Amino acid sequence: MAVQMEYEKDVKVAALDGKKIAVIGYGSQGHAHAQNLRDTGHDVIIGVRPGKSFDKAKEDGFDTYTVAEAAKLADVIMILAPDEIQQELYEAEIAPNLEAGNAVGFAHGFNIHFEFIKVPADVDVFMCAPKGPGHLVRRTFEEGFGVPALYAVYQDATGNAKNIAMDWCKGVGAARVGLLETTYKEETEEDLFGEQAVLCGGLTALIEAGFEVLTEAGYAPELAYFEVLHEMKLIVDLIYEGGFKKMRQSISNTAEYGDYVSGPRVITEQVKENMKAVLADIQNGKFANDFVNDYKAGRPKLTAYREQAANLEIEKVGAELRKAMPFVGKNDDDAFKIYN
């Protein structure tokens, strides 16, 4: 199904005007949404638990409250805490303070779609999901444009939920460059699949496998790192800018021929079947339940996965090589760490 891109001119109702907005969480997305909305003239407060994020929000000039206090004061509440803590945060501090006619928003549909959070029928539920990390949402806004976003309505109690979603997207700068309407189901399942099968899980597994093939064949680990990881950014940037066509126009004929001949030997029909199995586990809720149950148990699986990943040879080789390349990593990493 084709969807139509919408822009600022399509946001017909200033649905956030006169509303008190509470951004719950001051992490990667939270700081960006809050600051952008404030800069577009909206009345924004922050709800966050005591700690570094609380202090940072106050330092940035926001009226900062506990989550419960902010939820009680607000008309529109955007929950931007990590997915795994949203349920307990909502049940303990937000739900008891909701009133009929309030609106609750999310930047990802995980907890609503999989029904970890159930919002009363007299409250709107909407989504504004920028397609980029928070530091980029903020930086591009300050530069005069923005990051595209998806928007959705899960529950329209007041008849105004879509207007709120679109006006929120406008307030954070996304409508400057483009909005796409979606559903909670579609955004959640596609987002998780993209992360797991391609962007994060698939990509890192592909890089690691390539590194292992080369080093096991006797090639120097340092050279293998450059071939399968370091140069990845150069290729991805070309695809990002102009699709596969621009990338293939920019590489050598040798590389292009090898692309066509060998790509299908690596990503076979069996790999596609494996991807379908990943999608099925997302659709039926298995992944979501496994993730939430691991969090509730103290994150034993996630902790073990992190330790295993940190000890990969490619990570150790890369850390040493990057010391000799000071130009690598000069971006927003330090700013990003502040908010996580």
Curated annotation (Swiss-Prot):
Residues 183-328 form the KARI C-terminal knotted domain. The active site is at residue 108. Substrate binds at residue 252. Its cofactor is Mg(2+). Pathway: Amino-acid biosynthesis; L-isoleucine biosynthesis; L-isoleucine from 2-oxobutanoate: step 2/4; Amino-acid biosynthesis; L-valine biosynthesis; L-valine from pyruvate: step 2/4. GO terms for biological process: isoleucine biosynthetic process; L-valine biosynthetic process. It is an enzyme of class 1 (oxidoreductase). Signal peptide: none annotated. It catalyses: (2R)-2,3-dihydroxy-3-methylbutanoate + NADP(+) = (2S)-2-acetolactate + NADPH + H(+); (2R,3R)-2,3-dihydroxy-3-methylpentanoate + NADP(+) = (S)-2-ethyl-2-hydroxy-3-oxobutanoate + NADPH + H(+). Residues 3-182 form the KARI N-terminal Rossmann domain. GO terms for cellular component: cytosol. Binds 2 magnesium ions per subunit. GO terms for molecular function: ketol-acid reductoisomerase activity; magnesium ion binding; NADP binding. Keywords: Amino-acid biosynthesis, Branched-chain amino acid biosynthesis, Magnesium, Metal-binding, NADP, Oxidoreductase. InterPro entries: 6-PGluconate_DH-like_C_sf, KARI, KARI_C, KARI_N, KARI_prok, NAD(P)-bd_dom_sf. NADP(+) binds at residues 26-29, 49, 53, 83-86, 134. Mg(2+) 1 binds at residues 191, 195. Its EC number is 1.1.1.86. Transmembrane segments: none annotated. Mg(2+) 2 binds at residues 191, 227, 231. It comes from the Bacteria. Belongs to the ketol-acid reductoisomerase family. NCBIfam families: ilvC, PRK05479.1, PRK13403.1. Involved in the biosynthesis of branched-chain amino acids (BCAA). Catalyzes an alkyl-migration followed by a ketol-acid reduction of (S)-2-acetolactate (S2AL) to yield (R)-2,3-dihydroxy-isovalerate. In the isomerase reaction, S2AL is rearranged via a Mg-dependent methyl migration to produce 3-hydroxy-3-methyl-2-ketobutyrate (HMKB). In the reductase reaction, this 2-ketoacid undergoes a metal-dependent reduction by NADPH to yield (R)-2,3-dihydroxy-isovalerate. This is Ketol-acid reductoisomerase (NADP(+)). The lineage of its organism: Bacteria, Bacillati, Bacillota, Bacilli, Lactobacillales.
